Amino acid sequence: MSFYHTLQHATASAREHLFNAPIIEACRKGDISRGTYVDFLSQAYYHVRHTVPLLMATGGKLGQEYEWVRGAIAEYIEEEYGHQEWILNDIRACGGDAEAVRHGQPGLPIELMVAFLYDQIQRGNPMGFFGMAQVLEGTS
């Protein structure tokens, strides 16, 4: 079994729990208000704006044995660069105040997640970044 399949298997119940959260169910049914969607986008902005800096930090902390990962990180950076601006554009399109979001602060859960990731990269295992990426990419 590949690592990806092992990871998918090991996290199946947690992913199922997440997908059954009331807000996710409402999204699946298209039963959310514009305000709720703008709130979601606002919090998404606060972590997405850190994706490229986190990837850069990850690449910088990897040992020589992970040189092969750096090329993939460079491609990932190129793919992700500017996505935070897409979110702000979506907020504007929904009638939200994108500049207030740009200059605002995240909620505590997003702040803690981002802080944990920077700490994990600097003091723990930089490859830990990819766990968060797997969760967020898998639910978006």
Where are these regions (language model features)?
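Charge-dense, low-complexity intrinsically disordered segments
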Residues: M1, D31, E67
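Alpha-helical transmembrane segments of integral membrane proteins, especially early/N-terminal helices
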Residues: M1-H9, I91
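Short linear motifs at secondary-structure transitions and domain/linker junctions
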Residues: M1-S2, S13-A14, G104-P106
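A short linear-motif detector with a strong N-terminal bias
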Residues: F3-H5, L18, L108-L112
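Alpha-helical bundle segments that constitute or directly flank the non-heme di-iron/ferroxidase center
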Residues: Q8-L18, C27-G63, G82, R123, ...
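Short N-terminal binding/cap micro-motifs at the start of the first secondary-structure element
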Residues: A21
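His/Met- and acidic-residue-enriched segments that coordinate or traffic transition-metal cofactors
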Residues: I24
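Active-site-proximal alpha-helical scaffolds that flank and shape metal-associated catalytic sites
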Residues: W68-S140
